[in-house]
């Protein structure tokens, strides 16, 4: 009877104070025999309830502090209100890829200049980058490691080499067994390169990780020596192993470490390297030996097609022209490798930079056109309106060791997406904006060069008025009395995210939120929004956290990101995790005994 009465009342206790709980329980046990039982039971409950209320208070305070942190505002370089975080460290990490790339450039001392559009203080340093990564790992270790695989994956992911190495080395110093399992289990060399393994082997401070990777390298080297002797295919390990007779002191030092690992003398190390590289038929080696006519153009890697395109014509003109002619005809026996490259590599190769604010186009280039045409079309890309930022700040360079600009990235993505849009209304059309939005139509352009020439006519390099763009979209449907269905289902905004402040500025509301209210006031729903960050400065200026129609936050330079753009998810974290599950699910199995599922 006592327990039944107590059970019927316990659900109401959560909202009561400690004294009220005590009185309530006194009623529950009034029929108990003896004061001793009553007293002991009451004291026990009071102690337990005190702990419960304290825990509840802490939980409430933590919830408040989390909400306060997530609601913290920041400001763009143009004084627009933004959010400092998306509310998820994993999403913040994924939205900061350009900044992470710059941090890695500094980390590995690869900077060639220190020209920053908004100043170096606005960029992310390596300490901040690693802190963000570790924060994400502590929140969700499994998905953070999936993200790391995605960051490196040359074909399915972002293709970021230095970011991956910096972060994997750091986490490897902290959790060496887990990282060793990650590298071996996911077969890093198949979605990255063998020099990733070598770099971490040389850089790690963990003896466990260093020794474990040493065994991996030594075993692969021995297998390749045997495979070469049998005439079989071998790995690309020797392509990236440093030579011991190079002019670089650092490389000679690293070669000495490998000699010791493999128990070889300097001569014994040099001889198999030369033989194995010859067996690989590496393009760079044949070029350095002036063996141009021995190069099979069908097997030339993506980047080498760009790097040597003029040299091929100069040193092997007849064969090269015949190869290009076969490509133009669509000869099935002839192919060009174009998968392992960034779209901006092709666009940038067409640009001739005359000054910081001025550039022109190089002459028509058949290789650039073929590389562009060979890019695989995205799947299910439909009903998405591209909005490309053409403001002055987009002329910022991606990193301090690159001449590529954020504008070249935006151009390449905008042209690629518009070209492959299955919706006839948006096919080969998109909006560019700066001081004012303009519609760009490239449907009459036959070549990539023609498209770039037309696009550059719309650049005005002034401010970043995204509000005017959505005003134009809204004004169009209102004036023409168009239904909601006439609007695109999604808008893809490719930008550095340094938006101007709203015309009616409010420190607590972002310009995008202002635009959404305008749509709602006039009876429309703002389309789903996809923000694609291409700038080193946007890591702490999140344009939006939630949106009724859905929001996706992406960054980076790979066309594989479009797979996430076409996602039907409405929440940025769910969209990212769905992408990671689709492309990096092997990590679930590889790390099942090494990390906890959040």
Task: Describe every region a protein language model picked out.
Residues 55-409, 419-598:
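Long lumenal/extracellular ectodomains of secretory and single-pass membrane proteins
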